[in-house]
Amino acid sequence: MKTSLFKSLYFQVLTAIAIGILLGHFYPEIGEQMKPLGDGFVKLIKMIIAPVIFCTVVTGIAGMESMKAVGRTGAVALLYFEIVSTIALIIGLIIVNVVQPGAGMNVDPATLDAKAVAVYADQAKDQGIVAFIMDVIPASVIGAFASGNILQVLLFAVLFGFALHRLGSKGQLIFNVIESFSQVIFGIINMIMRLAPIGALGAMAFTIGKYGVGTLVQLGQLIICFYITCILFVVLVLGSIAKATGFSIFKFIRYIREELLIVLGTSSSESALPRMLDKMEKLGCRKSVVGLVIPTGYSFNLDGTSIYLTMAAVFIAQATNSQMDIVHQITLLIVLLLSSKGAAGVTGSGFIVLAATLSAVGHLPVAGLALILGIDRFMSEARALTNLVGNGVATIVVAKWVKELDHKKLDDVLNNRAPDGKTHELSS
């Protein structure tokens, strides 16, 4: 039993996170030097994200009997994303207005260090809707894979899958090659995942070592408010959606616990993307649905990021005594409905979108970003965890709506009743 526990990726990552926190707190200089360990692990994951998405989407689409099903899946997914993301934005807006974590700070925007957030403000200038849409189209196929742009790879994979499907029996050889290549890629993922504890230790030690626990205390009310909001969203909103779909949100969270710990350690939901593709398929969702919903959700269904954006924007307004009446808040909501779709599931992207939103709204000081710059890294964990759970739930819901969900398999796996007597997980 003890040997099995020590070999568990769940236990190893949890232990690594605890060691990272202690190391960063008591030896901050050493903690800061651990950053390459976390960065290196995330880079290894990013290295195989593009081929994983390509293989999953191509084999999923090419293996379908009807192409109409693909279009229906995409339409249902986008509708679900828009509804749930809007709910997340509204919940964040309501709670930050009720709690008012920034009230009474009376910060003068002129005294804030605008240079500290200049890099985010500059990047935010390129976050327009037209620029976002054009960025989905790659300049070249090789460029899409080289940059690791999820939506660009997804677009090419969908087109490739359609074309391969039209070839019929002539394309069987190509289909078999891609399917075999997919198995090799997932073998690489299993090898990389053995390094997850090292990556989590390095990332957590760096975060605590660089920013310190004192930063948490200074703006603790906003952090606590945000974490509680994310928990309520997962339990109440996603929990209700899960119950209506026929499964327990708590059993689902238990099923993806290792992925959640990896995300907790790296602060990026992208680090768990390859494993989520595999685990959602093993949960009973058809490969074509998983291949479309999960990658697309990383830009269009970021529930945690949506909550963060409304809360952070209103917090800055409260702290700087900027006017934020109902008209301004509705304007903010409309802007965020568009700008939040440009936030990829990587560390720091939410901060860039927030800068773009403040610029678009106009009357909120962009320099106010300096107020939350130090604690943004601590809130990124809750964002990433909520995003991951949200995309997992979305996949099951969409699969059910388009009748591509194996309900018995879903129930068996979540209740540890797999036919082979094992839980459906990647090896650790």
Swiss-Prot record:
Transmembrane segments: 8-28, 44-64, 76-96, 142-162, 184-206, 222-242, 326-346, 352-372
Subcellular location: Cell inner membrane
PROSITE patterns: NA_DICARBOXYL_SYMP_1, NA_DICARBOXYL_SYMP_2
Domain of life: Bacteria
GO CC annotations on file: plasma membrane
Keyword Cell inner membrane appears in the UniProt entry: yes
Membrane topology: Multi-pass membrane protein
InterPro entries to which the protein is assigned, alphabetical: C4_dicarb_transport, Na-dicarboxylate_symporter, Na-dicarboxylate_symporter_CS, Na:dicarbo_symporter_sf
Signal peptide: none
UniProt keywords, alphabetically: Cell inner membrane, Cell membrane, Membrane, Symport, Transmembrane, Transmembrane helix, Transport
GO molecular function: fumarate transmembrane transporter activity; malate:proton symporter activity; succinate transmembrane transporter activity
Entry-linked SUPFAM superfamilies: Proton glutamate symport protein
One example of a Gene Ontology biological process annotation: L-aspartate transmembrane transport
Keyword Transmembrane helix tagged: yes
Recorded family membership: Belongs to the dicarboxylate/amino acid:cation symporter (DAACS) (TC 2.A.23) family.
Function of the protein: Responsible for the transport of dicarboxylates such as succinate, fumarate, and malate from the periplasm across the membrane.
HAMAP family: C4_dicarb_transport
Full protein name: C4-dicarboxylate transport protein
Organism: Shigella flexneri
Gene that encodes it: dctA
